[in-house]
A protein has these predicted regions:
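Sec/Tat signal peptide C-region and signal peptidase I cleavage site
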Residues: 3-9
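A generic "folded-domain core" signal
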Residues: 9-154
């Protein structure tokens, strides 16, 4: 499971900003953590109050974790899957609390490939009350932010 930035003892430091994506590094009690993250360019519906939405790709070398993809839509998810779509490619994430993850490393590798070639990504999830939320993300800058996070933690 991804450790949210709120639980870091130290403030994450930017390793580089690349268009819509940014890379960060932070020291935790388990060692260095590096991640690339982005915010959505569009969120709907506006009427639903929620915290920030984000996509993260995380590296935790001391825990042998790489390419861990996590999503938050800024609300606790209903006990259901969260979907990611770009073009004809669809992925399902399992949710727990206010985060969602892919099921295994194989899916993460496929998703990283998609993110490298995609221009945009749409994430759909349901709140605990069953309302659907949709976040639209730009993939512009992803590859550079991803490569920076990976290099800093290798």
């Amino acid at each position: 499971c991804f450790v949210t930035s709120n639980s870091f003892a130290n403030t994450p430091k930017s390793s580089g900003k690349y268009k819509n994506w940014e890379s960060f590094t932070v020291m935790t009690d388990k060692g260095k953590v590096c991640f690339a993250q982005t915010k959505p360019v569009k969120r709907a519906p506006a009427a639903i109050k929620r915290k920030d939405s984000r996509i993260f790709v995380t590296f935790r070398p001391n825990e042998n974790v790489k390419d861990e993809i996590s999503i938050t839509s800024g609300h606790a998810y209903k006990n259901s899957t969260v979907s990611a779509k770009s073009g004809k490619s669809n992925f399902s994430f399992f949710s727990q609390g206010d985060f969602a993850w892919l099921l295994d490393e194989n899916e993460e590798k496929k998703f990283i490939k998609l993110m490298k070639r995609a221009t945009d990504l749409m994430i759909k999830g349901k709140t605990k009350d069953g309302a659907e939320t949709t976040d639209h993300y730009s993939m512009m800058g992803f590859t550079k932010a991803y490569n920076t996070a990976k290099k800093v933690c290798s």
